[in-house]
Structure formats: structure tokens, C-alpha cells
Amino acid sequence: MSETSRFDRVRDWQRGLDTLGWWHSFELPDGTRIKGINSLEHQRNRLAQFPIPDDLRGKRVLDVGAWDGWFSFEMERRGAEVVSIDVWDNPRFRQMHDLLGSRVEYRVLDVYDLAPSRVGRFDIVLFLGVLYHLKHPLLALERVCSVTTDLAAVDSFVLKEEHRPGSSVDARPIMEFYEADEFGGQTDNWVGPSPAALMAFCRTAASTSRSTTGRAIRPTRRTA
């Protein structure tokens, strides 16, 4: 994928969001579907990358950067007690919360402020599509691991050789920093780690946080 096409895709997402208003797609209990930028199939496939059981009764799940909340509500549907956080109060999350009669706890909280003393600990933490929006990705991963007792599910945009032909970035633990709007014309995209860098971040974060044992951090990689 060329630099231009990568940026065009992000801009297409933004135009679609401006038109549709929803980032996530939903299917309501009565069968009504709400169309968002991301299809239901795409959302389900993202979750399927991780070893998350269909039956989550008795489990606590944290969704970091919940946005419209599909992943939060899906975890609740599977029986989990769910806490969702984001850095802003998203009215679409609250609207869907009401439509579903949900009991998910929704909090406006920065990932950097996560701590067991503040939110408790969770069997599963979802950290999906958030890392590249952060100035301090390793610190954020350490905060995620500090509240995880079993599985931290991580996916992120990664910088690959197709973005920088001839650079062999895939296997090197390097990262691009976007000072302004270099990535897709958006000022909230800060970093582009290579696949090797993402894996190294996850290993480091998991080993740095020693508050629990048996933790697994499972990263997956998306090019855009």
C-alpha cells in the first residue's frame, strides 16, 4: 500500500464517519442493524484473533478506548462484567447503552491513569486500535498490563515495508513519530510502530508489570 493510498483510506474513514455518525456497526435484539464505518463481520473477525471464550460468566473485562462500544457490549453479551473507558464522553455509546438496556459501567478515564487502586483488576483487557493514537505507547501498555490478570488483547496499526518500500521495516523494532497530521491528515495519530516494535513493546510491558502472574499479552497487527 502506497503512502498516498494509506492516507486516502484514513480520510475515507473520516468522511464516512462524518456521514454515518457511527464507527461501530450494531445488531439490536429486534434484528435492526445500525451501519457504521466498521462492519459487524470486521468487528467479529478482530475479536476472533484472540482466545476469548464465548462464555465469560464470572469474568471481568475492561475495554480501553471503547468508542461506540460494540466490543464492550459483545463482552457483556457473553456474560462478563464490563467496564468501558474513553477519554471523552461519547453520546453514541450512551445511546447504544440505553437501546440495549446495558449494565456496562462507562467511565471517562485516560489509559495513563489506569491502576489497580483505581479500577481494580480484570481477567481480560481489550486494547484495540488505540496504541497508535498515543504519544506514550509503552507507558500505556504498562498501565494496561498493571490491571490485567489473564489476557491483554492488543491490536494496532503497524508500519510495514509496503509503506516504506525497500526499507525492511517489518523485522526491525523501529517506530515513526507523526508530529502533526502526517498520517492521514489526522492530528490524533502519533506513532507507527513496526511489527517487531509492537511485539517488543508488548513483551516489555508484560515483564515490567509484576503485580500478577500468568498474564498473557496477545498483540495482532493491522496495516491500516
Can you annotate each of these PLM segments?
Residues K59-W67:
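Conserved class I S-adenosyl-L-methionine
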Residues V111-P116, F122, L126-F127, K135-A224:
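S-adenosyl-L-methionine-dependent methyltransferase catalytic module, highlighting the catalytic core
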